[in-house]
Amino acid sequence: MPPSISAFQAAYIGIEVLIALVSVPGNVLVIWAVKVNQALRDATFCFIVSLAVADVAVGALVIPLAILINIGPRTYFHTCLKVACPVLILTQSSILALLAIAVDRYLRVKIPLRYKTVVTPRRAVVAITGCWILSFVVGLTPMFGWNNLSAVERDWLANGSVGEPVIECQFEKVISMEYMVYFNFFVWVLPPLLLMVLIYMEVFYLIRKQLNKKVSASSGDPQKYYGKELKIAKSLALILFLFALSWLPLHILNCITLFCPSCHMPRILIYIAIFLSHGNSAMNPIVYAFRIQKFRVTFLKIWNDHFRCQPAPPVDEDAPAERPDD
């Protein structure tokens, strides 16, 4: 007999479904926009597509699995472990995509004349592939043995049971907090976030330095170029800020759970942290729509062409790759 759902669980499920209904169409629209608009085909937007793919998977896969775990079905230990690992893979993929975007922006302002020969679409695809492979390695590490099976088996055998343990499937019952804090957070989340902060600080410094230089007659229009780069850096730094704001609370709660086992953790705080982490997948398309004109124009074109059946002005695909707010 399936477990009954409380009013609190029903509210949780309703909010998760709402997040998924915003996240999946929004990020599919991002991928669609890059596909139909040639002006959104440079390396930066390749990394943005990778980020959008991870966000689509959060809405289409992770949130349904989170709802399933919240209901608390009884499953075999390794079945529950397989349900818990996708969120680790997708979180890591998002972090590495954001890091790749930060490095890309740094190279664009550090070596503007050589940028297109250094950062080619082919190399961007190789970088994205490497990021996903690394994400699977990090996210599937609990499947290789760093999990709570030993502790669960002790309790299982102490009760006189045999075979693989059957448990109430919950994330913290199968995923080791040592893994989440020491390996996942301290190695694969916090250092990349700090590195990205340093990279964007350097990007802003280089841009300000160039903008403060006097413009010579033979220099083309560096003020315009670096002005655009400043706008895109601000937009992408905002994406990074929202990611950190969304995911750090959950990792901080994990640290409290590990280092202070006796500390009482209000359940509502855990739910808020979960909502923030899942809600991040719905934020990026909104930021793109408001801050990147080429995305905004392409979104409207897709809407008019495919949903309103009204022709929209054509997007100039021969125009140079768009910068936010340009």
Curated annotation (Swiss-Prot):
It comes from the Eukaryota. The keyword Transmembrane applies. The chain crosses the membrane at residues 11-33, 47-69, 81-102, 124-146, 177-201, 236-259, 268-292. One of its GO terms (biological process) is regulation of sensory perception of pain. Keywords: Cell membrane, Disulfide bond, G-protein coupled receptor, Glycoprotein, Lipoprotein, Membrane, Palmitate, Receptor, Transducer, Transmembrane, Transmembrane helix. A lipid is attached at C309 (S-palmitoyl cysteine). Receptor for adenosine. The activity of this receptor is mediated by G proteins which inhibit adenylyl cyclase. This is Adenosine receptor A1. The gene is ADORA1.
